Swiss-Prot record:
Keywords: Biological rhythms, Coiled coil, Cytoplasm, Nucleus, Phosphoprotein, Repressor, Transcription, Transcription regulation
Any Pfam family hit: CiPC
Organism per entry: Homo sapiens (Human)
GO BP: any one term: negative regulation of DNA-templated transcription
Mutagenesis / variant outcome for changing residue 186 to A: Loss of predominant localization in the nucleus. No effect on CAD- AND HSPA5-binding
Gene name in the database record: CIPC
Annotated protein name in UniProt: CLOCK-interacting pacemaker
Phosphoserine, modified sites: 213
Region (Disordered): 1-85, 162-224, 378-399
Amino acid sequence: MERKNPSRESPRRLSAKVGKGTEMKKVARQLGMAAAESDKDSGFSDGSSECLSSAEQMESEDMLSALGWSREDRPRQNSKTAKNAFPTLSPMVVMKNVLVKQGSSSSQLQSWTVQPSFEVISAQPQLLFLHPPVPSPVSPCHTGEKKSDSRNYLPILNSYTKIAPHPGKRGLSLGPEEKGTSGVQKKICTERLGPSLSSSEPTKAGAVPSSPSTPAPPSAKLAEDSALQGVPSLVAGGSPQTLQPVSSSHVAKAPSLTFASPASPVCASDSTLHGLESNSPLSPLSANYSSPLWAAEHLCRSPDIFSEQRQSKHRRFQNTLVVLHKSGLLEITLKTKELIRQNQATQVELDQLKEQTQLFIEATKSRAPQAWAKLQASLTPGSSNTGSDLEAFSDHPAI
């Protein structure tokens, strides 16, 4: 058997293997470049895969060192320069070799291929300042004021009309103590009206005998009850010893009251009360009749007999009488009552006259003695009634 010489065949085989390896490397490079070009053309290339080589990184570091920047001081220098140049801006962001593309608004330039949003370029690093939206500073004092306003805000208060009194914040913040003091002040003001009117004129000596031991006469109690009920009592005579209750018929017959009594200090203090009867169209009764003001004043001067509550009632009644007289409502009320009484009396007379007229017509038609007797019987009691009515009307003047 012939043995092959390995020394002769090995260099050829090795050279063939090396040639095949170099060819395969070339083919791989060509395929890689073609794939990269196809990816770039199709638009699906990834920029992150194309990293910088070590040589390019060394070149960028050399350029930064030539500019005076070091690798460790780079963020400090960037922040310092940004703060010095633009104190109001935020720290800058360094983007290496990346160019951000702006999107075109025109629809004609749009294509079917997908375009990348950024492109890797070989140039110096670019600095982009990003401005975050900074909200306006809000002071804490304004927020506190808003909170306090929101607590006191009531939409009902703003709906009041202009003519109505708008309630303020002070009225809402009133405590129970302040409300109590205001009520006490109102009570004091109402109680001061009575003593001021009664003490305006000094009392005459011997006019009203007031002693704690002597009880009040029953006539005074009757006059007081009638005064509290709102019926003006007419006292006959000017002396307080002759107090007499008057019936409601006499009260209704009196068209107005005489305020010229010498024993009434309230009437003496008011000049408008005197001479009222001379100006009124309906002349009242004689001057001997007194007003209910005198009775109220006389009853108010006996504190030992009546309690404080009844005295306050008398004071209020007295003040009411004075106010009604000054405004003229008291005279108007009395005149209205008198007119109502006269109207009722006239209506009764008209009814009687109609009945008598009907009887007279029946008697004339039938000519019967019974009808005439009935007519005569109706006229006999009617004549006495008419006479009494005429006497009642004679006490008062014609209107």
